[in-house]
Amino acid sequence: MSSEREPSIPEVTDLGLTSDCGSCFGLCCVALPFAASADFAIDKDAGRPCPNLQQDFRCGIHRDLRPRGFTGCTVFDCFGAGQKVSQVTFDGQDWRRAPGTARQMFDVFPVMRQLHELLWYLAEALTRPAARPVHAELRAALEKTERLTRGSAEELMELDVAAHRGEVNALLLRTSELVRAGVPGRKKERRGADLMGARLKSADLRGANLRGAYLIGADLKGADLRTADLIGADLRAADLAGADLTGALFLTQSQLNAAKGDAATKLPQSLSRPAHW
C-alpha cells in the first residue's frame, strides 16, 4: 500500500479564495467597467476609478451600496484574486504610487479572477467522495492552476486562460456526472436552459444539470436543489426562499448574492447567507 497521504480538506481548500478587500488596491472598483442599469447607478469605463473609491482603496458608500444603486458591487466576488494580484503579483506596489503599473495590473486582475474561480471549483470537487475516481487528476489540475496564479504579470497576460479552463471544465463535468449519479431517480437535464421567470416552486431538482441555465427571476421557493449542478447558472433575482441547496455542485457566493432568499434557505457549508436576504 502506498504511504503517500492524500491531502486533507483544509490543505486543499486553504488557497486564499476568500476576498480580503483590506489587502487589495480596490481593483474591482477600477479595473472593471460597468454601465448604468439596475445593478449600477452610473457608467464607468475599465481602468477608471469609481468615484466612490477613497484614497485608502476603501468604498466610501460600502454600507449603502444597494440603496444608492450599486447592487452589482454587493454581488461581485473576486475569489481572492484582488489581494493575490495586489500583494503577490505586484508585491504590494499599488497603482497610485506606481502609476506605471496600473494598466498591467488592471489587465492581470480578470485573468487572476478566472484562475481563482477554477481553484474554487477544483477545491470543491476534491471534497466529493463520489468523485474519488478523478481525485488524482483534480489534484494535479489544482496544483497546476495554483502555480499559474504565482506567475509574473507578463506570464499571466500571455496565458491562454480559455484553453486551461477547457481542461479543468472537462474534469468538473466528470465530477458532476459521478456525484449526480448517486441521486436516485431520473435527473433533469436543463443545461443552458432558458428558465427566466420559471415557476419552479417546490420543484424536485435533485441532481439536476442546471449548468449555465438562465434562472433570472425564477420562482424556486421551497425547491429541492440538493446536489444539482449550478455552475454558471444565472440566479439574478431568483427566489430561493425555503429552497434546499445542500450539497449543490459548484455554487458560488456571487450567485447567492445575486439571488433572493430567507432564513429558511439551506446552504452549502462553504457559503454564507447574504446580508440582504
Language-model segments: which ranges?
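Hydrophobic scaffolds flanking metal-cofactor catalytic centers in soluble metalloenzymes
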Residues: M1-A136, A140-L159, A163-E167, L171-G182
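Tandem repeat scaffolds
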Residues: L173, A181-W277
